[in-house]
Amino acid sequence: MAKKVEKLVKLQIPAGKATPAPPVGPALGQAGINIMGFTKEFNARTADQAGMIIPVVISVYEDKSFDFITKTPPAAVLLKKAAGVEKGSGTPNKTKVATVTRAQVQEIAETKMPDLNAANIEAAMRMIEGTARSMGFTVTD
C-alpha cells in the first residue's frame, strides 16, 4: 500500500546552500524530518543551479520518511538576473527600473514552462511579462 502523506512543507532555499539553520531547520524539525538528510540531498540535487532560489515541496509521510520536488526558480528572480538589477521598483506604475527584451522573456518562459499553468509558450510569455511590469520593468521588442 502507498505511504500516506502526513504533511507538505513548502520552502524557497538558495540552491546548494540548505543548512540546518533557520528558516530550513525549524520548518523541517516541526515536520519531524531528518534535517541533515534533507540538506545533503537538496544541496546535491541543486549544486548545478548555484545562486538561484529554488522552491521545494517536501512530502512528509506518516513514518517520518520524506521526498521532495524541486521547482524552477521564481519568475521574479529570473527577471532580476536577466535585467541585471538587485530589486524591482517600489512604485512600478511610476518608476521603471529596468528593461527586458521579448527574447529574454521567451527564454524565461521556456525555463518556467513546466511549473506554469499555461497551454502554450505565448501564454507563458504573457504571464512573465505581467510579472515584469509589476516589478517596474519595461518589456521591449
Curated annotation (Swiss-Prot):
Function according to Swiss-Prot or TrEMBL: Forms part of the ribosomal stalk which helps the ribosome interact with GTP-bound translation factors.
Name of the protein in question: Large ribosomal subunit protein uL11
PROSITE patterns: RIBOSOMAL_L11 (PS00359)
InterPro entries, per database record: Ribosomal_uL11, Ribosomal_uL11_bac-typ, Ribosomal_uL11_C, Ribosomal_uL11_C_sf, Ribosomal_uL11_CS, Ribosomal_uL11_N, Ribosomal_uL11_N_sf
Origin species: Streptococcus equi subsp. zooepidemicus (strain MGCS10565)
Keywords: Methylation, Ribonucleoprotein, Ribosomal protein, RNA-binding, rRNA-binding
Family the UniProt entry places it in: Belongs to the universal ribosomal protein uL11 family.
NCBIfam families, sorted: L11_bact
